[in-house]
Curated annotation (Swiss-Prot):
One GO molecular-function entry: nucleosome binding
Ranges of biased composition (kind: Acidic residues): 938-994
Keywords linked to the UniProt accession: Chromosome, Coiled coil, DNA damage, DNA repair, DNA replication, Nucleus, Transcription, Transcription regulation
Stretch list, region Disordered: 443-498, 755-774, 936-1019
Protein name (database record): FACT complex subunit spt16
Assembly behavior: Forms a stable heterodimer with pob3. The spt16-pob3 dimer weakly associates with multiple molecules of nhp6 to form the FACT complex.
General function of this protein: Component of the FACT complex, a general chromatin factor that acts to reorganize nucleosomes. The FACT complex is involved in multiple processes that require DNA as a template such as mRNA elongation, DNA replication and DNA repair. During transcription elongation the FACT complex acts as a histone chaperone that both destabilizes and restores nucleosomal structure.
Protein encoded by which gene: spt16
GO BP terms, alphabetized: constitutive heterochromatin formation; DNA repair; DNA-templated DNA replication; nucleosome assembly; positive regulation of RNA polymerase II transcription preinitiation complex assembly; regulation of sister chromatid cohesion; transcription elongation by RNA polymerase II
């Protein structure tokens, strides 16, 4: 050992402390992994190059960073004893004086002195207890080992030996710190780069050029590449401070093909030539003693069954990776894998590997952390594993050569267990079908003369497709024709089903007149008896009774009360010395506006239109007119508030949990907030609902499970908050506001600090610090997600009798749009379409949707709109505007997958008019084809560009007419022409068709077809 050896004291004491803490905690545990050992022996003899990484030297690397041959460690609960030579002892001297004492016993060449030190260690072991932890599987050898065994053998019968290997795995090697993870990540990136940037190129070149090379020779090429520092320095994923001198082989490289495969780590490359078919490559690299391993299967001209089996293996691999998260029992990973194989291809169950990986770190394979169906160890964040899925000796009947009709497959990745899932360190070497498939044989197939004509046609079609997709705006609309055909067929079935459901639903019913629900006449009474009149009426003056909402007017010497609901307005005017008060009353036929829809009990009765009173008291009449106006405003406001509160149902009482403390989620904010300051409160789960408790004034909000329609949990991935959202069946009041959505959230971000000049930053600037910061951010977010998800599941469990279930948005199929005023991300869930991040929230229940319509779907536009029509036709359709056209196919696929019928068209429609038509006669609407008129608009798009333009103009004029009848419009001239248009509609339609036919004929004569015109116009 050279003088350059420097042991990291900080790392040594941190790791030694964690080891002792785990040992002491284990003594209090009911599930002991240390086996009750009072002392622990770690014996290291000569360095064994053939079997260089076992538990004994792994503990050396873990604690010291180096291997110290001919050294004995004896751990007791109070002291760590080290027996070694004087040369090695000087490197250990700085470790004295720590929190845990380290006593160094120096041996010499004097055999008696060495025996005396060993006897001292034996006495220490005996005094520590009758159980001693050893490593029975380690096969260390050498004179030092023999001398120790001779002395130790005298007491070996007096003490009970326990295997300490599982304890070392759990306490030392399983959960890695930041430095260890950085080393494993760098080793993994070196593996990925060597596999994807070197081996794949070499392999494909050999096969393409049909050169012969043995597996062993190719392995030696890869072996030599590890000394090429320039190669590793050029790898983009490796950090700038990566030291190529610190890497070494941990395993392999091993190349296999041609029907002979061995998926064990003991496999070696044989002398057979590399052959096409199934090629398996695997190797492992160490960086600063920490291992990473990678394995890939490459398919060269594969058969259909081989492709299918590899796709199955990909699915299994992905499923196992998803299970590799904090808190999962190790055996669940294997059970998940074998369950998928058993469900999808039971005939391959016997060919599946017996485990799906093992722990990896200093040891290439930790035998105590094998991921099989029996391991009950719990995975923790920070653990690292080599995940391996494989199929062994699968027969391929289509291959005639009996020596090659058997193949194996394998995928191996090095991963880190995270809070919510794994971090795949070797992901840069692709495993998808496109990355591992190679096709060389197809190029040699001769073209048959009989198919020459057909081939020419295909080439023409292909070139035309290239021409059509040369514009970027068109590319998102290119879809798989087979999938599009299946989707179109499914939509036809859904449309027919909707029409049939509509006919069955509205059979024998009549709609609302003019598509508007008729208001009922409401009786109102100012006073039931004469003695209830105010005393001031004796003065025979105009009196405004605010309490009774009545205006009392003297008529013929008698006070006559008029309820404010009969009064339209009041005005005061001056003429000479007199002031005039005019009171206008509501009566039939006064107006045709939408607001003039006051119902009357008997339209044939006589109605008083207005009263005019005269007085010289100008100020008095001004005050009366003002009082009547205010009274009318207050009455209208009360009516509006009453209307808004019609659907607010008073909830039952919340049944609180009394016999124990309720489950709580602390430090959460409420939306919509309670009145006052924005402060965090807590959510409690009670017997029949939730209660949000504010820290101020003992305010609270109760939500009953019986009123919960949807319960959502949205994690904080790509968001600033993590939230639980409750969508209610009927709205409730929070303060003075009515709401149907209640949200509990917590912010996921922290205050960031600039560490410039900080001593810590000065010494840790670079990749390690960045990695640590990322780790901390992920850890904090993952902890938030875990806490909120667990609480949401507890809510669902408490409300399961009311059908409460947790729904999580699918961000990967979400799309941006404008449901209100701002552009937000809208995400589907299992039962709804939601936007929960920004208020106002959007929650659309899928089972309430009648049909969806895509508007403004036409060439040249960068976005489109989406309209949802509900089964309750009195409910206004919901619009989501300005969705990027890139999401068009994704939106269609999602709508089709959840069985929502959809149509599309090039224009925005007047949905107020459409829904009035539907509501006025729903049965007649469905009898005439229902929503098929929307689909007809979509079908017309398949015609030429000329047809699209004429349809556009026709629809625009119709729309303008509809809109002008509904509300003020800039196109009044078009609206006024609507009657004239309807008189000769059929005739003008024929004229346009005839003109269009003539125009097409002339274009054909000039050699210009529709497609050419379309392209010209596009330029």
């Amino acid at each position: 050992m050279g003088d350059e050896i420097v042991i990291d004291k900080t790392a040594f004491f941190n790791r030694l402390s964690s080891f002792y803490a785990a040992w002491k905690a284990d003594k209090r545990s009911t599930n002991s992994v240390f086996g009750g050992a009072g002392s622990i022996i770690i014996l290291m003899g000569k360095t064994d190059e053939a079997n260089s990484y076992q538990k004994n030297n792994a503990i050396h690397f873990w604690l010291l960073g180096y291997e110290f041959p001919a050294t004995l460690f004896v751990f007791t609960p109070e002291v760590m004893y080290v027996v070694t030579t004087a040369k090695k002892a000087k490197h250990l001297e700085p470790l004295k004086g720590g929190k845990i004492p380290v006593e160094i016993l120096v041996t010499t060449k004097d055999q008696e002195e060495k025996t005396r030190l060993f006897e001292k260690c034996v006495d220490i072991i005996k005094s520590a207890g009758n159980k001693v932890g050893i490593l029975p599987r380690d096969t260390t050898t050498g004179p030092f080992v023999e001398d120790w065994k001779r002395v130790y053998g005298k007491i070996s019968g007096d003490v009970e030996e326990v295997d300490i290997s599982p304890a070392l795995s759990a306490a030392c090697f399983s959960v890695k710190d930041t430095d260890e993870l950085v080393s494993i990540r760098n080793a993994s990136r070196a593996c990925s780069g060597l596999m994807s940037d070197y081996f794949v190129d070499e392999m494909s070149r050999l096969l393409d050029e049909e050169k012969q090379m043995t597996h062993k020779a190719l392995s030696m090429r890869i072996d030599a590449k590890i000394d090429d520092a320039k190669f590793f320095n050029k790898l983009a994923k490796l950090p700038s401070e990566f030291d190529p001198q610190q890497i070494d082989w941990a395993y392999g490289p091993v190349i296999q093909s041609g029907g002979k495969y061995d998926l064990k780590l003991t496999a070696v490359s044989d002398d057979n030539n590399l052959e096409p078919g199934i090629i398996i490559a695997g190797f492992g690299i160490r960086y600063k003693t920490y291992s990473s391993i990678i394995g890939r299967t490459y398919l060269v001209d594969p058969t259909k069954s081989q492709e299918a089996n590899y796709s199955l293996l990909l699915s299994v691999h992905e499923a196992v990776l998803k299970e590799a998260r904090d808190g999962v029992v190790a055996k669940e990973l294997y059970n998940k894998a074998i369950g998928i194989v058993r469900a999808r291809k039971p005939e391959l169950e016997s060919h599946f590997v017996k485990n799906v990986g093992a722990g990896i770190g200093i040891e290439l394979r930790d035998s105590n952390m094998i991921l099989n169906g029996k391991n009950t160890r719990v995975l923790k964040s920070g653990m690292t594993f080599s995940i391996t899925v494989g199929l062994v000796d699968v027969e391929e009947p289509s291959v005639k050569d009996k020596k090659k009709n058997v193949y194996s497959m394998m995928i191996t990745d090095t991963v880190r267990v995270g809070e919510q899932g794994p971090h795949v360190f070797t992901k840069d070497a692709g495993i998808d079908m496109d990355s591992v498939s190679f096709y060389f044989g197809d190029e040699e197939e001769p073209q048959k003369p009989a198919k020459e004509k057909k081939e020419t046609k295909s080439s023409a079609i292909a070139s035309r497709n290239v021409t059509r997709t040369k514009l970027r705006a068109e590319r998102p609309t290119q879809v798989n024709e087979g999938a599009e055909a299946r989707r179109r067929e499914h939509q036809k079935e859904l449309a027919a089903k909707k029409t049939k459901e509509g006919l069955d639903r509205f059979a024998g019913t009549t709609g609302d007149d003019n598509g508007v629900t008729q208001k009922k006449f409401k009786r109102f009474e100012s006073y039931k008896r004469d003695n209830q009149l105010p005393a001031k009426v004796k003065d025979l003056t105009v009196y405004v009774d605010h309490k009774a909402s009545t205006v009392i007017v003297p008529v013929m010497g008698r006070p006559v009360p008029f309820h404010i609901n009969t009064i339209k307005n009041a005005s005061k005017s001056d003429e000479g010395e007199y002031a005039y008060l005019r009171i206008n009353f509501l009566s039939p036929g006064q107006g045709v506006g939408r607001k003039d829809d006051q119902p009357f009990e008997d339209l044939s009765a006589h109605f008083l239109r207005n009263l005019t009173l005269r007085s010289k008291d100008n100020d008095r009449f001004a005050q009366v007119a003002q009082d009547i106006t205010e009274l009318r405003k207050n009455a209208l406001r009360r009516e509006q508030e009453k209307k808004e509160m019609e659907d607010v149902v008073e909830q039952d009482k919340l049944v609180e949990i009394r016999n124990r403390r309720p489950v709580k989620l602390p430090d959460v904010y409420l939306r919509p907030p309670l009145d006052g300051k924005r402060v965090p409160g807590e959510v409690e789960i009670h017997q029949n609902g939730l209660r949000y408790v504010s820290p101020f004034r003992n305010e609270h909000v109760d939500v009953l499970f019986s009123n919960v329609k949807h319960l959502f949990f949205q994690p904080c991935a790509h968001e600033l908050i993590v939230l639980i959202h409750v969508h209610l069946k009927t709205p409730i009041m929070i303060g003075k506001r009515k709401t149907r959505d209640i949200q509990f959230y917590r912010e996921a971000t922290e205050m960031q600090f600039d560490e410039t000049g900080n001593r810590r930053r000065k010494h840790r600037y670079g990749d390690e610090e960045e990695f640590e910061a990322e780790q901390e951010e992920r850890r904090r977010r993952a902890a938030l997600d875990r806490e909120f998800k667990a609480f949401a599941e507890k809510i669902a469990d408490a409300g399961k009798d009311e059908g409460v279930d947790v729904d999580i948005p699918f961000r990967e199929i979400g799309f941006t749009g404008v449901p209100n005023r701002s552009n937000v991300l809208i995400q589907p869930t299992t039962d709804a379409l939601v936007q929960l991040t920004e208020p106002p929230f959007l929650v659309i229940s899928l089972n309430e949707i009648e049909i969806a319509h895509l508007e403004r779907v036409q060439f040249g536009l960068k976005n489109f709109d989406l309209v949802f029509v509900f089964k309750d036709f009195h409910r206004a359709p919901v619009h989501i505007n300005t969705i990027p056209v890139e999401n068009l196919e994704g939106v269609k696929d999602w709508l089709d997958s959840v069985d929502i019928a959809y149509t599309e068209g090039p224009l925005n429609l007047n949905w107020t008019t459409i829904m009035k038509t539907v509501v006025s006669d729903p049965y007649g609407f469905f009898a005439d084809g229902g929503w098929s008129f929307l689909a007809a608009e979509s079908d017309s798009e398949d015609g030429s560009d000329e047809e699209e333009e004429s349809a556009f103009e026709l629809s625009e004029s119709e729309l303008a007419a509809d809109e002008s009848s509904e509300e003020d419009s800039d196109y009044d001239d078009d609206a006024s022409a609507d009657d004239d248009f309807s008189a000769d509609e059929d005739e003008s339609g024929e004229d346009w068709d005839e003109l269009e036919h003539q125009a097409k004929k002339k274009d054909r004569e000039s050699g210009l077809d529709d497609e050419d015109r379309g392209k010209k116009r596009k330029r």
